[in-house]
Amino acid sequence: MSRLNIEQVYKEAQALLEGHFLLSSGNHSNFYLQSAKVLENPKVAESLAKALAEEIRAFGLTIDTVCSPALGGVLAGYELARALGVRFIFTERVEGKMTLRRGFEVASGEKILICEDIITTGGSAVESAMEVERLGAQVVGYAALANRGFCQRVGSSLERKPNAKLPPHLPFFALDDFVFDLYSPQDCPLCKTGSKPIKPGSRGN
């Protein structure tokens, strides 16, 4: 699936938003990808997950389980696990820390792929990885529907940015790169005009 097609999917779902946004990473941006609007359509969710699964299979990665950080990554992760024919689990934030709950367990050495809907710096994905690794599993890679251009994905010429948090030694799969402006709160030009950011993401609402 080409970049143009994926971008069109987001536009048709009214999921490519322009404005002033506070991202879950704490940074500000003039664009936001609201994947929930895309994934509310089961057929679209299935097709995106199948395309992502094809890339992962072509790479030859062995996966036992897909794990996603709640809430934003759950739909994407579940559909990807279904496309790959593997188990799905999720972590959720408890008192500020990503935690595996609800009876989910991982085995020692279990090969886990961490999946988000969108990865910017990858902070939440890494927190989920740390939790399953603490319990004995082995994280073998990361995946997302789209990469906001800070982490280097398999098959992309974009270079890894200094604030990327995904470990560079593990493969990162995404269907496309969406490169939008990203600002620290202190340097945000939108804030300097008096605009206040809104927070449409998964931390806080």
Curated annotation (Swiss-Prot):
SUPFAM superfamilies: PRTase-like. Disulfide bonds: none annotated. Homodimer. NCBIfam families: pyrE_Therm (TIGR01367). Catalyzes the transfer of a ribosyl phosphate group from 5-phosphoribose 1-diphosphate to orotate, leading to the formation of orotidine monophosphate (OMP). Belongs to the purine/pyrimidine phosphoribosyltransferase family. PyrE subfamily. Its cofactor is Mg(2+). 5-phospho-alpha-D-ribose 1-diphosphate binds at E116, D117, I118, I119, T120, T121, G122, G123, S124. InterPro entries: OPRT, Orotate_PRibTrfase_bac, PRibTrfase_dom, PRTase-like. CDD domains: PRTases_typeI. Its EC number is 2.4.2.10. GO terms for molecular function: magnesium ion binding; orotate phosphoribosyltransferase activity. It holds the Pfam family Pribosyltran. Keywords: Glycosyltransferase, Magnesium, Pyrimidine biosynthesis, Transferase. This is Orotate phosphoribosyltransferase. It catalyses: orotidine 5'-phosphate + diphosphate = orotate + 5-phospho-alpha-D-ribose 1-diphosphate. Pathway: Pyrimidine metabolism; UMP biosynthesis via de novo pathway; UMP from orotate: step 1/2. Orotate binds at T120, R148. GO terms for biological process: 'de novo' UMP biosynthetic process; pyrimidine nucleobase biosynthetic process.
